[in-house]
From Swiss-Prot:
The keyword Cytoplasm applies. Thiol-specific peroxidase that catalyzes the reduction of hydrogen peroxide and organic hydroperoxides to water and alcohols, respectively. Plays a role in cell protection against oxidative stress by detoxifying peroxides. NCBIfam families: PRK13189.1. Its EC number is 1.11.1.24. The keyword Oxidoreductase applies. InterPro entries: AhpC/TSA (IPR000866), Peroxiredoxin (IPR050217), Peroxiredoxin_AhpC-typ (IPR024706), Peroxiredoxin_C (IPR019479), Peroxiredoxin_TDXH (IPR022915), PRX_1cys (IPR045020), Thioredoxin-like_sf (IPR036249), Thioredoxin_domain (IPR013766). Homodecamer. Pentamer of dimers that assemble into a ring structure. The active site is a conserved redox-active cysteine residue, the peroxidatic cysteine (C(P)), which makes the nucleophilic attack on the peroxide substrate. The peroxide oxidizes the C(P)-SH to cysteine sulfenic acid (C(P)-SOH), which then reacts with another cysteine residue, the resolving cysteine (C(R)), to form a disulfide bridge. The disulfide is subsequently reduced by an appropriate electron donor to complete the catalytic cycle. Belongs to the peroxiredoxin family. Prx6 subfamily. It comes from Staphylothermus marinus (strain ATCC 43588 / DSM 3639 / JCM 9404 / F1). It catalyses: a hydroperoxide + [thioredoxin]-dithiol = an alcohol + [thioredoxin]-disulfide + H2O. It holds the Pfam family 1-cysPrx_C. This is Peroxiredoxin.
Length: 235
């Protein structure tokens, strides 16, 4: 039976996994870094191939965010090796990050990545883990629909903004329809705090205040470039 999905805010479970880069102990292998774990249904499949190419082409963008990547499927290590060799030979793209081999589905089951109706295919999932090994985000995608890698980049950046500045990011940040690239101030816990925030920040009301200029402009523009790239690719 598939395992229970770990919850956001919980510690990523300790495990030793096999990859084409050798054995890796998680989460210690990425200690001090953010990392994105993404599972895919199977090697040598069209949608998964497009995703791996997209992740590889954006790998340097992730590294700029102090973020590493690691894939996972219930394929064997040999299958992973042959698949990434095929991608390099046929598509001219080298896959620089490790891919977990989980042919028995042990890891996938532990992380809740096996569909209830199938024990032979991992679902298309994304886990974002912070430098302390805490799961910060979990996203699932349909079998037939590939992930938007630039949106995953944006999500990682948004999580880092929360960690660094103690602020929340609005919908479509940094291009929010109401407050642009500003960030949201956490709601006040007392009447006094609410009154003070109305004086200190721009507010629509006491419970909805925001702060301008928190994130450096160059960082904002970098995120906008990712989103513009994604929009151009969709045309």
């Amino acid at each position: 039976m598939p395992g229970t999905i770990p919850l956001i805010g919980e510690k990523f479970p300790e495990m030793e996994v096999v990859t084409q880069h050798g054995k890796i102990k998680l989460p210690d292998y990425f200690k001090g870094k953010y990392w994105v774990l993404f599972s895919h249904p199977a090697d040598f499949t069209p949608v998964c191939t497009t995703e791996f190419v997209a992740f590889a082409k954006r790998y340097e963008d992730f590294k700029k965010l102090n973020t590493e990547l690691i894939g996972l499927s219930v394929d064997s290590n040999f299958s992973h090796i042959k698949w990434i060799e095929w991608i390099k030979e046929k598509l001219g793209v080298e896959i620089p990050f490790p891919i977990m081999a989980d042919p028995r589905g042990t890891v996938a089951s532990k992380l809740g990545m096996l569909h209830a109706a199938s024990s032979t295919h991992t679902v298309r999932a994304v886990f974002v883990i912070d430098p302390n090994g805490i799961i910060r985000a979990i996203i699932y995608y349909p079998l037939d629909n590939g992930r938007n890698i630039d949106e995953i980049l944006r999500l990682v950046k948004a999580i880092q903004i929360t960690d660094k500045y103690g602020r929340a990011t609005p919908a479509n940040w940094p291009n929010n329809e109401l407050i642009g690239d500003s960030v949201i101030v956490p709601p006040a816990g007392t009447v006094k705090e609410a009154e003070e925030r109305l004086k200190k920040y721009k507010c629509f009301d006491w419970w909805f205040c925001y702060e301008e200029g928190v994130v450096p402009k160059e960082e904002v523009e970098e995120v906008r470039k990712w989103l513009e790239r994604a929009a151009k690719l969709q045309k």
